[in-house]
Regions:
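Surface-facing alpha-helical segments and adjacent helix-coil boundary elements at the starts of domains
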Residues: 1-217
Length: 217
């Protein structure tokens, strides 16, 4: 994803904005993802949301996009609990499914790497590009401190049939992730990532190849 996108609402019609905020439709572009008003979407998706959750969503509206998603995830888990967040993971709106992955990871951040990866795997293989991006952004902060363990656990993902899963194996630990904190250890010693990059460097999928190129550059 590029972080230098123009003002997200500049070219989005009011009717389309209303559809996005209602949760009736998926976003089609990054600009549409950025244009969503999360507090408005929440009131449509969870009309019985407690006031504390609504207030957290209002605060999230003014944050950067990654902080917005993290805040929504944590607030949803705090106020609605595990079962409700699992239900949201199957919602028709991509942003809501993104909230769910942040919510579930926020409560399992101290779990072992295999547990974390199993948790985000459905989102990593989601048909929507945005949800797939949220999946690695949600789990990356919890993989980075355990690099060797994470690289070992991700190695089998490099041979998965799904190009989405294979891409996740590379994207989740990119030394210079877009909108995500860099991983200094991999910037200093990028060769530590070779167990992931070697199997993927000649991947048949351009989607995967692009991630490997981004990892190296």
């Amino acid at each position: 994803w590029r972080s230098d996108v123009m003002s997200p609402t500049a070219s989005i019609a009011a009717e389309r904005q209303a559809d996005l905020n209602s949760g009736r439709d998926e976003s089609r572009t990054l600009a549409e993802i950025l244009a969503i008003t999360h507090s408005a979407l929440l009131t449509q998706v969870v009309p019985e949301a407690p006031e504390g959750l609504v207030e957290a969503a209002r605060r999230a509206d003014s944050l950067g996009i990654l902080a917005r998603m993290q805040t929504m995830g944590e607030a949803l888990y705090t106020h609605l609990g595990h079962s409700a967040c699992l239900d949201l993971a199957d919602h028709p709106a991509d942003t809501v499914r993104g909230w769910a992955v942040f919510a579930l990871v926020s409560q399992e951040k101290d779990a072992d790497v295999d547990t974390l990866l199993a948790l985000v795997r459905p989102a990593a293989d989601d048909p929507h590009f945005g949800v797939r991006e949220w999946s690695w952004m949600a789990v990356r902060p919890h993989l980075a401190p355990r690099l060797d363990e994470a690289i070992r656990a991700l190695r089998p993902w490099t041979s998965e049939p799904s190009e989405r899963i294979r891409r996740f194996a590379s994207e989740s630990l990119r030394p210079r992730g877009v909108w995500a904190r860099h991983i200094p250890a991999l910037k200093k010693e990028p060769e530590r990532g070779l167990p992931l990059l070697e199997p993927l460097r000649a991947d048949s999928s351009r989607y995967v190849q692009d991630s490997v190129a981004n990892w190296i550059n």
